[in-house]
Amino acid sequence: MPRKITSYKTSLQGLREENEDVELMNLNLLLTGKPNNPKYAPIDLFIVCDGHGGKEVAEYVAPRLNRYIMNNNNTFPLHRQHVAKIYDAIQNELIGKGIARTWWMYCSSYY
């Protein structure tokens, strides 16, 4: 069914010298992660990483969440346990690469 989606983003830097937030919006995706017919949108993906783990963590996590969520082997809607496994896998990558200084990512994704 055709529909129109308009998305906006805004950010408040606060007291830090730079904004560490990272947002990723992919609209109108097929399960392959590729754009679909512009009139139809089976999946819209919104990811927000608030930077509390540091900018490097936010920049690392956002595209990886996109890749894991849009994996061709996934069946939607994703089950809570599967989403938890995705977050655990990315967290283990962060720790393994020495990027994460803490055990949390502070990211949300919606599809």
Swiss-Prot record:
Coiled-coil blocks: 3-29
Keywords: Coiled coil
SUPFAM superfamilies assigned: PP2C-like
Position of the signal peptide: none
Pfam families: PP2C
Domain (PPM-type phosphatase) ranges: 6-111
Protein's name according to its UniProt entry: Uncharacterized protein R306
Native organism: Acanthamoeba polyphaga mimivirus
